Amino acid sequence: MPSATTASTNGANGASASPAPGNLSANDNIRRFAAPSRPLSPLPAHALFNDKTRCFVYGLQPRAVQGMLDFDFICKRSTPSVAGIIYTFGGQFVSKMYWGTSETLLPVYQEVPKAIAKHPDVDVVVNFASSRSVYSSTMELMEYPQIKTIAIIAEGVPERRAREIAYVAKKKGITIIGPATVGGIKPGCFKIGNTGGMMDNIVASKLYRKGSVGYVSKSGGMSNELNNIISQTTDGVYEGVAIGGDRYPGTTFIDHLLRYQADPDCKILVLLGEVGGVEEYKVIDAVKQGIITKPIVAWAIGTCASMFKTEVQFGHAGAFANSQLETAATKNKSMREAGFYVPDTFEDMPALLKQVYDKLVADGTIVPAPEPVVPKIPIDYSWAQELGLIRKPAAFISTISDDRGQELLYAGMPISDVFKEEIGIGGVMSLLWFRRRLPDYAAKFLEMVLMLTADHGPAVSGAMNTIITTRAGKDLISSLVAGLLTIGSRFGGALDGAAEEFTKAFDKGLSPREFVDTMRKQNKLIPGIGHRVKSRNNPDLRVELVKEYVKAKFPSTKLLDYALAVESVTTSKKDNLILNVDGCIAVCFVDLLRNCGAFSTEEAEDYLSMGVLNGLFVLGRSIGLIAHYLDQKRLRTGLYRHPWDDITYLLPSLQQPGPPGTEGRVEVQI
């Protein structure tokens, strides 16, 4: 049997001794379990599970697996019941699960043969494969002699396939639980998948220790109700199986009740049948023949079917009476006549079960065991938070979008309204960047900026970097980033600086001449002033477009007017010291923030200090950089190498030998 590899243990379940606080590492909270040295001893013929049962879970079902491990932990098993996961759609990896409050790693296998070879102690498979693939996966699993029990969870398995599975399983001596089942449970030992519900329900139903009552039902949901009834009226469940609601289950009532009959620890049998099928009559025959002698408390659900004028299909595929013999009323009558304990209604079942239990306790057949200490339930953090038991500060805060509901929200605006109201890219930017709707002219201005800054030809540094990177064979993201990384104070990034300097001078009340003189005395260039190509006589049409729009639409253009006055001063000195597109956009954006009515003075200053203006240039220029990438790819251009004649080489030369102490000096000759 595999065992935990921790060297020293204390407490329940062999919990690892706490390491010294100064020696903690990321792996100190992970429990590891050694592989088994040999297969387990075979179980008695009547037993499917014990406290050493190990299984595979077929399919990626982390919640079900975690529920099984939590059950193992509170039952004080020494090892997890799940040895590994078989998931055919991914490579081999490990899945991290909780073992109590620690963590453990479960192997995930892509192929059944590898899983079987690694775990000779596994004899149970919980098959979560879909109805389309469950047939092939189950048939494959049954090829391995070590597999003795398979639970098929899927609903909708074709009846012919279900009958084939049952036939092959019977021939090979394999027990099939399902299809269309929640599974089964053996308290204190093993549970299949999601059987028993959540951990608080399992503890409330006392499924962490064995009782004396074995039940079998068709319905998985009703098996949960039986767990509750049995825990309140007796010493608890010994074993419970839901055979599934399909018409052709792999095993039937009689198969499991015969196992319970052969098990000396199971004292009372409970049968919960339903309308449809004739499996209850096999149990009746076994009782009449004396094969089953233990008391059976039984009920067939669906007595209300007689109230309808026509036959009614209930929830399960097999819950349909094709004859009078298959009706719930006839079944209950036949079971009562055969000596079963059958209540008048399902509501009377708990009282009748308690009556039978008390009788067996009185005659000494059942000796109630002392009630053990109720185990502590490990609670997932998310579940505890949902119940309001704990609180924790969030690691991140987002105030711009929310994808948790049925519809994506941009700053509280549903995405459907974004399209319905046709707010455009500028409107979306206003919602996500500024968390509010800006006036239409402001949204239009944002779009205008993106269009004007989208590209400025292949010669600028950003485009050149993108082109060279693309021609080196790099991908789109790498080529785009190569161009974006050139954006700064010298290329494209003058917007924030221009906004800061012009705003500071304007707010101080400096005249345009005083502003220019102040910057000259500080030996600073004025951001947003000057162009390498354009001049007063050869104006930048982009600037003209911005000025024309802003003058026509903005309620106030005080800072733009101030910048144009500064331009008059600078161009009197040199013709190309014009207000360039960066400077024009910057001062107009400040006018927008201050005068559109959507921002307070403090908010306007905050957004400027955040670098929102450079964000406009980055967003706009990304369009052009991607265009240059696509252009070079489309042209199938090769690796770029710069020509030698465009490079001036100035290499150092070593000085001729001279006086001692001058060795190794380097002179640069120009």
Curated annotation (Swiss-Prot):
Location(s), subcellular: Cytoplasm
SUPFAM superfamilies per UniProt: Citrate synthase (SSF48256), NAD(P)-binding Rossmann-fold domains (SSF51735)
Family to which this protein belongs: Belongs to the succinate/malate CoA ligase alpha subunit family.
GO biological process: acetyl-CoA biosynthetic process; fatty acid biosynthetic process
Keyword DNA-binding belongs to the record: no
A GO CC term attached to the entry: cytosol
Major localisation: cytoplasm
Descriptive protein name: Probable ATP-citrate synthase subunit 1
Molecular function via GO: ATP binding; ATP citrate synthase activity; metal ion binding
Role, per record: Catalyzes the formation of cytosolic acetyl-CoA, which is mainly used for the biosynthesis of fatty acids and sterols.
Record: residues binding ATP: 257-277, 308-334
Region (Disordered): 1-22
Residues at which CoA binds: 335-345
Active site: 316 (tele-phosphohistidine intermediate)
Top-level class of the enzyme under EC nomenclature: transferase
Self-association state and partner proteins as the record states: Composed of two subunits.
Catalytic activity entry: oxaloacetate + acetyl-CoA + ADP + phosphate = citrate + ATP + CoA
Residues holding Mg(2+): 274
EC numbers on record: 2.3.3.8
UniProt organism field: Neurospora crassa (strain ATCC 24698 / 74-OR23-1A / CBS 708.71 / DSM 1257 / FGSC 987)
Keyword tags: ATP-binding, Cytoplasm, Lipid biosynthesis, Lipid metabolism, Magnesium, Metal-binding, Nucleotide-binding, Phosphoprotein, Transferase
